Amino acid sequence: MYAIIETGGKQIKVEAGQEIYVEKLAGEVGDVVTFDKVLFVGGDSAKVGVPFVEGATVTAKVEKQGRAKKLTVYKYKPKKNYHKKQGHRQPYTKLTIDAINA
């Protein structure tokens, strides 16, 4: 059985036991997170939400809170002596999917 959930402005296909990386969620390591924005549940009998499946939830456990590798953002304007260098590290949350309840 699998499901498609919405979190952090993205849609992610998940299965039980899968490890996923999502945009940062509030919670400490070991906390249980419940997603109620389930768009689709697949398996023996597929359920499509309009826009979400009624009563369907996905539970996951927080494994890690971290930050991605640094990206360098560099801006410049030619002939104007304007240079700007900036770094960015996007925070993320690593989850392990426990169960899909439909």
Curated annotation (Swiss-Prot):
It holds the Pfam family Ribosomal_L21p. SUPFAM superfamilies: L21p-like (SSF141091). NCBIfam families: L21. Part of the 50S ribosomal subunit. Contacts protein L20. One of its GO terms (biological process) is translation. PANTHER family: 50S RIBOSOMAL PROTEIN L21 (PTHR21349), LARGE RIBOSOMAL SUBUNIT PROTEIN BL21M (PTHR21349:SF0). Belongs to the bacterial ribosomal protein bL21 family. This protein binds to 23S rRNA in the presence of protein L20. PROSITE patterns: RIBOSOMAL_L21. It comes from the Bacteria. Keywords: Ribonucleoprotein, Ribosomal protein, RNA-binding, rRNA-binding. GO terms for cellular component: cytoplasm; ribonucleoprotein complex; ribosome. GO terms for molecular function: rRNA binding; structural constituent of ribosome. The keyword Nucleotide-binding does not apply. This is Large ribosomal subunit protein bL21.
